[in-house]
Amino acid sequence: MPITLPATLPAFDVLTHEGVMVMTPERAARQDIRPLRIGLLNLMPKKIQTENQFARLIGATPLQIDFQLIRMTEHQTKNTAAEHMAAFYRPFQEVKHEKFDGLIITGAPIEHLDFSEVTYWDELCEVMDWTQTHVHSTFGVCWGGMAMIYHFHGVPKHMLAAKAFGCFRHRNVAPVSPYLRGFSDDFVIPVSRWTEMRQDEIDAAPGLRTLLASDEVGPCLVEDAGHRALYIFNHFEYDSDTLKQEYDRDIGNGKPINVPRNYYPDDDPTKPPLNRWRSHAHLLYGNWINEIYQSTPYDIQQIGR
């Protein structure tokens, strides 16, 4: 089954060209199927790139997906055209009375700030509390996952002495988890962050279970069954060239940055990078969507009751 997107959303043409099944809302309405309603609370500056990345992953599953784009109500983005935001995004205050089978809360490049210093922190706290009554399963990504684990459990983030940047080996530490069906024991995941969550502090918080971890960059994927949530601190959703774009940007701006580790062949930035995480990215998000499908109420209004 396809993902439902407006025909004018850039992701529609991108995914169609890649062979992902996409349909318009008008066509979806003619099918006698209840699609899974998945929201994307997009906090990233490059909105369109992030839309494409997550739509690609959840659109590759066998289920029909109704993909809804959500923004913070008062925060004004500076990197995406206002026309795009007006055409495709709805503010949280407009959707907060609706129910969702799943919600993805993305990262944001504001790691250097304390959570309380983020201009939209109060509304984001409202969003996170709202997920407990209006969303069946929530997936917090990178800063979004750190924000959720801090909000619900008080586990803090910590600044790193140097940016964790590159493709790092990770271990599958919970192979029986339904979210890790098909996962190898050892694989790489793109990492790009200045902060970390510490394993001992996660272990001390009741109800948290680490599923993926790295000897070099720490815990990666954490399950929070009590809040029906997953938190991932690294970037399975990244395109093949996302780390390259970040590296080239910082080099162009004269910022000190190391070559992303284990990313370019022979660690040579003149060579095209290789994508070694794509299959596991599809597995993780496909497993998440499948778990939602298996457990969400058929009547979406029953979510949270």
From Swiss-Prot:
<dbReference type="InterPro" id="IPR033752">
    <property type="entry name" value="MetA_family"/>
</dbReference>
<keyword id="KW-0808">Transferase</keyword>
<feature type="site" description="Important for substrate specificity">
    <location>
        <position position="192"/>
    </location>
</feature>
<dbReference type="InterPro" id="IPR005697">
    <property type="entry name" value="HST_MetA"/>
</dbReference>
<dbReference type="GO" id="GO:0004414">
    <property type="term" value="F:homoserine O-acetyltransferase activity"/>
</dbReference>
<feature type="site" description="Important for acyl-CoA specificity">
    <location>
        <position position="111"/>
    </location>
</feature>
<protein>
    <recommendedName>
        <fullName>Homoserine O-acetyltransferase</fullName>
        <ecNumber>2.3.1.31</ecNumber>
    </recommendedName>
</protein>
<dbReference type="InterPro" id="IPR029062">
    <property type="entry name" value="Class_I_gatase-like"/>
</dbReference>
<dbReference type="GO" id="GO:0005737">
    <property type="term" value="C:cytoplasm"/>
</dbReference>
<dbReference type="GO" id="GO:0008899">
    <property type="term" value="F:homoserine O-succinyltransferase activity"/>
</dbReference>
<feature type="active site" description="Proton acceptor">
    <location>
        <position position="235"/>
    </location>
</feature>
<keyword id="KW-0486">Methionine biosynthesis</keyword>
<dbReference type="GO" id="GO:0019281">
    <property type="term" value="P:L-methionine biosynthetic process from homoserine via O-succinyl-L-homoserine and cystathionine"/>
</dbReference>
<keyword id="KW-0012">Acyltransferase</keyword>
<feature type="binding site">
    <location>
        <position position="163"/>
    </location>
    <ligand>
        <name>substrate</name>
    </ligand>
</feature>
<feature type="binding site">
    <location>
        <position position="192"/>
    </location>
    <ligand>
        <name>substrate</name>
    </ligand>
</feature>
<feature type="binding site">
    <location>
        <position position="249"/>
    </location>
    <ligand>
        <name>substrate</name>
    </ligand>
</feature>
<keyword id="KW-0028">Amino-acid biosynthesis</keyword>
<comment type="similarity">
    <text>Belongs to the MetA family.</text>
</comment>
<comment type="function">
    <text>Transfers an acetyl group from acetyl-CoA to L-homoserine, forming acetyl-L-homoserine.</text>
</comment>
<dbReference type="Pfam" id="PF04204">
    <property type="entry name" value="HTS"/>
</dbReference>
<feature type="active site">
    <location>
        <position position="237"/>
    </location>
</feature>
<feature type="active site" description="Acyl-thioester intermediate">
    <location>
        <position position="142"/>
    </location>
</feature>
<comment type="pathway">
    <text>Amino-acid biosynthesis; L-methionine biosynthesis via de novo pathway; O-acetyl-L-homoserine from L-homoserine: step 1/1.</text>
</comment>
<keyword id="KW-0963">Cytoplasm</keyword>
